Amino acid sequence: MANTLFDRTIAFAGICQAASLVQKMAKDGHCDQAAFDTAIQSILETNPNNTVGVYGKEANLRVGLECLVRDFDNTPTGSELTRYLISLMALERKLAGHRDGMSKLGERISTIERQLDHFDIHNEQMLSNIASIYLDVISPMGPRIQVTGTPSILQQSMTQHKVRALLLSGIRSAVLWRQVGGKRRHLIFGRKKMVEQAKIILARI
């Protein structure tokens, strides 16, 4: 895959979309269904033709692109999003240095793909199985991501499954970010360029 500003922006928007949906799910118990489906499907796209192929098409990243452009501010919501983003990228770096972890992740995703021959991806058991990949493979690498939201909503098992599945999708996008050459310096010095690129993409979708 190409290491261009466009590719980095797409991958970063994928991480932003996961973080934004986690925040919405934890607070409200629901989120944009199409964006959620894109996030979950991205976990299973392990051999895409290009960067956009992970998400199907540019328009499927509207939530993430809009988040990238406008949501990272100094408000409590913006600070929380930033915390999720940094935590996801830190966990991905730990995963990248853990060969066994990458191998286990691949095996578990292959199992999910086989199960999809028999179950719908929205089935609670399927979402539970995807969530368990995050719990079993990613979470032990630490540090744990503290998700904040409405306590009564966060106590619901379906919400927990969806939040963990979304966190796994964030890890998937963080892996993509690294694969297309994303580095910390791009976040520090190249953020403005990514915002401009995101605006260009949003204008055409």
Swiss-Prot record:
GO cellular component, one term: cytoplasm
Topological type in the membrane: Peripheral membrane protein
Main location: cytoplasm
InterPro entries on file: HflD, HflD-like_sf
Cytoplasm recorded as keyword: yes
Keywords of the record: Cell inner membrane, Cell membrane, Cytoplasm, Membrane
Record bears the keyword Membrane: yes
Subcellular location: Cytoplasm; Cell inner membrane
Family: Belongs to the HflD family.
NCBIfam families named in the record: PRK00218.1-2, PRK00218.1-4
Protein name according to UniProt: High frequency lysogenization protein HflD homolog
